[in-house]
C-alpha cells in the first residue's frame, strides 16, 4: 500500500541533506509488504471508484489516501453529533459552536507528526510528463518509477482526460495541444501502445492532436521539450541564447531584473538550447515521430512552424515586435554563435549558465524553486555530467515532488506546507477552543518556528541575482529556501499571536531578533507604489512584458506587486507594531500608509480586487478587506470598504453562499460558477471579508445566511466536501489546494461565532 512519510530523510543517502532535519518533508512510499486490512483496501478502492465515476463533475480529487491513513493511525472517530439548521430556523450560538468543534477536531486529526498539514497542491497537467521524459532520457525511469508508480501515473492521466480526448492546461481546463501532446508521449513512454490505455486513451488523444494541427502547433515550452526528447527539431523553436546570462547588468532585460520563476525556467532551458541537446533516438522515439504529425517527419519545414501555436493554447498572443526579435536572433545571431570564433562566446555563456544552475540547486537543497525548473535543472546537470554528484543530488529530491491521491500519482508544484499551516493555525486560533487544541497548537507553533529561513543565500548572493531571505518563510519548508512575502507575513502573524499565549499551552515564543528579521524582509519588498512584491523587489519596467515568450501565461517576465501580499503584510505589521512599538516605527508606519494607498488604487470599478493566487475577485477582496480593517479602515471612514461590501453583497447567491468560476482569472471579470452554484471555500472568504468590514453591526442577515450554508454542508465526520478548484497562478493556470476546503469554512465559522452576536438556546 501507499503510505505518506513525514519529515524523513535517508541517512544512507550521501546525496540527500537538510538544513533542519527534514522538518516539513512529505514523501510517498509504496510498501509491497504491507497489504493492509481488507477494510483499508476497500476504503482506498472505494475512493478511487467514486472519483472515477464523478470525475467530470468534480475534477479536483479529495486527497483522500493520506487522510484515510492519518485518521486510521490516530483512531479518529467523530463523537460530536452533527447539526443542521432548518430553512426557517436561526443559527444559534450552540449550532455554530458544535459545527466549529466538529471541524476543529477533524482538522486537528489531519496534522502531521512534525506539526504541519500535508496536502496536494497540483492541478496543472504539464507538471509530470517532463519528469517522465527526463527520466526516460537519462535512463533512470525504471529505478525512480517502478511498476506501482507507473500504474498510478497512468491512472492520473486517464482520470483527467477530457471527454473530447484531449487534456487541459489544468484539470478543469479545455483541451490544449501542449498538455495533450505531453500526456500522449507520457503514456507511450510508460508502456502503452499507440491505441492503448483505458477507454482508448491513446487513440483518442492522438486523434485530438491530429485534428487540431498536429504537434507542430504545440506552444513554445512544448517545442522545447519535444526537441529535447527527439520528436521535434530545434530548428522549429525560437532561440533561447545562453548569452543572455553574460549580458551587462545595466541592460533593461538583464536576468537580474526578471521574475525569479521566469529566470529559473529559461536558465536551464537556454543551456539545453545552446547545446542543442537531444536525447537518445530509440525505436519509441521513431514511432512517436510518425504518430504526432499529419505529414512525414522528414518533410516538415521546421523553420516555418516556429511561431505556430494551436488556438486552444493561446492566452497571451505574441506581439509582432517579439516575433521580429526571435526572427532576428534566429536568422542573424544563432548562425554566428555556433561557428568559430563566436562559439567561444557560447562556450563561456554555457559555463556561466551552469554556474547559476548549480548555485540555485545548492541553495534549495536540490529542490529548486518549483517543479518545472526542477526537471530542467536536473536534466541540465545530467547533460553536463551524467555520472556527476549534481545529478545524483537531484534524483534524491524527486520524492519531494511526488503526490498520490485517489486519482493517481501527480507532481506537486512544490509543497504548500508553510502556507497551509499558517492559515490552518490562524483558523484554529480564531475558534477560541484553545483548551481543546493544546497539543495541536504547540506542534503547529513548533513547525512554524523550525521552518523560518535562518540565513541568506550563500556567498555573494547579489551577484547571483538573489535577494535576502534571512527571516523569511517559504511556501513549503526551510530547505526550499525561497523567501515569499505573504508566506513571511502569515508566519510572522502566527508567531506574534502565539507570543501572547501561555507557553505551557503553545510552547516557547520566538526570539524577538528572529521576528525583526521577518519584518526586515517585508519592508525590503515594498515598491514605490506601496504594493508588495512576492519574491524579490520590483526593479524592471512593465514594457518588458512584451517579451513574454510563453503563449499561456501573462505577467511572467518581471516581478509585480500583489494585493494579497500587500494585505497580508499590513496585517502582520499592524500586529507587530502593537507588540513591539519601538522597532522601526517610522518605517512601519510609512509602509502601512503606502500599502493602504496601493490597495485603494488597484481596487476594481465594481468594488472588488483581482486575486492573483486564488479564484479570484472573492479571494482578492477577502485579503484587501482584512488589510484595510487591520489598518483601521471601516465602512464609515473608507469608500473602498463600502464599495467592496456592495460587491460582495451583490454577488451573494440565493442559498447564502458565493461561487466564482476559475474563468474570472483569465478573463479578469467576475464570472459566477455555472448554474449559480455555491463553493464553500469562496463562501468562507466572502463571509470573512464582510465580517472584517463590520457587516454584523449594519445588517447581519447576509452573514447568517452564509453561516447556515456552511453549517448544513458539513459532512458526517466533520470534513467539508471537495468542490471546484480554488487556486491560480499567472492569470491562466489553476492550482488545487486540497486543504482549503477544511481551512476556510472552519475559519469563517470561527470568525462568525466570535464576532457576530448569536441567539443562545439557553436564553
Curated annotation (Swiss-Prot):
Pfam families, sorted: SQHop_cyclase_C, SQHop_cyclase_N
Enzyme Commission code: 5.4.99.39
Superkingdom as given in the UniProt entry: Eukaryota
GO cellular component terms, A-Z: lipid droplet
A GO term, aspect molecular function: beta-amyrin synthase activity
Top EC class for this record: isomerase
Involved pathway(s): Secondary metabolite biosynthesis; terpenoid biosynthesis
Keyword ATP-binding in annotation: no
SUPFAM superfamilies: Terpenoid cyclases/Protein prenyltransferases
Gene3D superfamilies: 1.50.10.20
Site (Transition state stabilizer): 419, 475, 613
CDD domains on file: SQCY_1 (cd02892)
Gene Ontology process terms (BP): triterpenoid biosynthetic process
Active site (record annotation): 486
Entry keywords, A to Z: Isomerase, Isoprene biosynthesis, Repeat
The keyword Lipid metabolism is annotated on this UniProt entry: no
Family: Belongs to the terpene cyclase/mutase family.
Protein name: Beta-amyrin synthase 1
Amino acid at each position: 500500500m501507499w503510505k505518506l512519510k513525514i519529515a524523513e530523510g535517508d541517512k544512507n543517502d550521501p546525496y540527500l541533506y537538510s538544513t533542519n532535519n527534514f522538518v516539513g518533508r512529505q514523501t510517498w512510499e509504496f510498501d509491497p509488504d504491507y497489504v493492509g486490512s481488507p477494510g483499508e483496501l476497500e476504503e482506498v478502492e472505494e475512493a478511487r471508484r467514486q472519483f472515477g465515476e464523478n470525475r467530470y463533475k468534480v475534477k479536483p480529487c479529495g486527497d483522500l489516501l493520506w487522510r484515510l491513513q492519518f485518521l486510521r493511525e490516530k483512531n479518529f472517530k467523530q463523537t460530536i453529533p452533527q447539526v443542521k439548521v432548518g430553512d426557517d430556523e436561526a443559527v444559534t450560538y450552540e449550532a455554530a459552536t458544535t459545527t466549529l468543534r466538529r471541524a476543529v477536531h477533524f482538522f486537528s486529526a489531519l496534522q502531521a507528526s512534525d506539526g504541519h498539514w500535508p496536502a496536494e497542491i497540483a492541478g496543472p497537467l504539464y507538471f509530470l510528463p517532463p519528469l517522465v521524459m527526463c527520466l526516460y532520457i537519462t535512463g533512470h525511469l525504471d529505478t525512480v518509477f517502478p511498476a506501482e508508480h507507473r500504474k498510478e501515473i497512468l491512472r492520473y492521466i486517464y482520470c483527467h482526460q477530457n471527454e473530447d480526448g484531449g487534456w487541459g492546461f489544468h484539470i478543469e481546463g479545455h483541451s490544449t495541444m501542449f498538455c495533450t501532446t505531453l500526456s500522449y508521449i507520457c503514456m507511450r513512454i510508460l508502456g502503452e501502445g499507440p491505441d492503448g490505455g483505458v477507454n482508448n486513451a491513446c487513440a483518442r488523444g492522438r486523434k485530438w492532436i491530429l485534428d487540431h494541427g498536429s504537434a507542430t502547433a504545440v506552444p513554445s515550452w512544448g517545442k522545447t521539450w519535444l526537441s529535447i526528447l527527439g520528436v521535434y527539431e530545434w530548428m522549429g523553436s525560437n532561440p533561447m541564447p545562453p548569452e543572455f546570462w553574460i549580458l551587462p547588468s545595466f541592460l533593461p532585460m538583464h536576468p537580474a531584473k526578471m521574475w525569479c520563476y521566469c529566470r529559473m525556467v529559461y536558465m536551464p532551458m537556454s543551456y539545453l538550447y545552446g547545446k542543442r541537446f537531444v536525447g537518445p533516438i530509440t525505436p519509441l522515439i521513431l514511432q512517436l515521430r510518425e504518430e504526432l504529425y499529419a505529414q512525414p517527419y522528414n518533410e516538415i519545414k521546421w523553420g516555418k512552424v516556429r511561431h505556430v501555436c494551436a488556438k486552444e493554447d493561446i492566452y497571451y498572443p505574441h506581439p509582432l515586435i517579439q516575433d521580429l526579435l526571435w526572427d532576428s536572433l534566429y536568422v542573424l545571431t544563432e548562425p554566428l554563435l555556433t561557428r568559430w570564433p563566436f562559439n567561444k562566446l557560447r562556450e563561456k555563456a554555457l559555463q556561466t549558465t551552469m554556474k547559476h544552475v548549480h548555485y540555485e540547486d545548492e541553495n534549495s537543497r536540490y529542490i529548486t524553486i518549483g517543479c518545472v525548473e526542477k526537471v530542467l535543472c536536473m536534466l541540465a546537470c545530467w547533460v553536463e555530467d551524467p555520472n556527476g554528484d549534481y545529478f545524483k543530488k537531484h534524483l534524491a529530491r524527486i520524492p519531494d515532488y511526488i503526490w498520490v491521491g485517489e486519482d493517481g500519482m501527480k507532481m506537486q508544484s512544490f509543497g504548500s506546507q508553510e502556507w497551509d499551516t499558517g492559515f490552518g493555525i490562524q483558523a484554529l486560533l480564531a475558534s477560541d477552543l484553545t483548551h481543546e487544541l493544546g497539543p495541536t497548537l504547540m506542534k503547529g507553533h513548533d513547525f512554524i518556528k523550525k521552518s523560518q529561513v535562518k540565513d541568506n543565500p550563500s556567498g555573494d548572493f547579489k551577484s547571483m541575482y538573489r535577494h535576502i531571505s534571512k527571516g523569511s518563510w517559504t511556501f513549503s519548508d526551510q530547505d526550499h529556501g525561497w523567501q515569499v512575502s505573504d508566506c513571511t507575513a502569515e508566519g510572522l502573524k502566527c508567531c506574534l499571536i502565539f507570543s501572547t499565549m501561555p507557553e505551557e499551552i503553545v510552547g516557547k515564543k520566538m526570539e524577538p531578533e528572529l521576528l525583526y528579521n521577518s519584518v526586515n524582509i517585508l519592508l525590503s519588498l515594498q515598491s514605490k507604489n506601496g504594493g508588495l512584491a512576492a519574491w524579490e523587489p520590483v526593479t524592471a519596467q512593465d514594457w518588458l512584458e512584451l517579451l513574454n515568450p510563453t503563449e499561456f501565461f501573462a505577467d511572467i517576465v518581471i516581478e509585480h506587486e500583489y494585493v494579497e501580499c500587500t494585505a497580508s503584510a499590513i496585517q502582520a505589521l499592524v500586529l507587530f507594531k502593537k507588540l513591539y512599538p519601538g522597532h522601526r516605527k517610522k518605517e512601519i508606519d510609512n509602509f502601512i500608509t503606502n500599502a493602504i494607498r496601493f490597495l485603494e488604487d488597484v481596487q476594481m470599478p465594481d468594488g472588488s480586487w483581482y486575486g492573483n493566487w486564488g479564484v479570484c475577485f472573492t479571494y482578492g477582496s477577502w485579503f484587501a478587506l482584512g488589510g484595510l480593517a487591520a489598518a483601521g479602515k471601516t465602512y464609515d471612514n473608507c469608500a473602498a470598504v463600502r464599495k467592496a461590501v456592495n460587491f460582495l453583497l451583490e454577488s451573494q447567491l440565493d442559498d447564502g453562499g458565493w461561487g466564482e468560476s476559475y474563468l474570472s482569472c483569465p478573463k479578469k471579470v467576475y464570472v459566477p460558477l455555472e448554474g449559480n452554484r455555491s463553493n464553500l471555500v469562496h463562501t468562507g472568504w466572502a463571509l470573512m471579508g464582510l465580517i472584517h468590514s463590520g457587516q454584523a453591526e449594519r445588517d447581519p442577515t447576509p452573514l447568517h445566511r452564509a453561516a447556515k450554508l456552511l453549517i448544513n454542508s458539513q459532512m458526517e465526520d466533520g470534513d467539508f466536501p471537495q468542490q471546484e478548484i480554488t487556486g491560480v497562478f499567472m492569470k491562466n493556470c489553476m492550482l488545487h489546494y486540497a486543504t482549503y476546503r477544511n481551512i476556510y469554512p472552519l475559519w469563517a465559522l470561527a470568525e462568525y461565532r466570535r464576532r457576530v452576536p448569536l441567539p443562545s438556546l439557553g436564553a
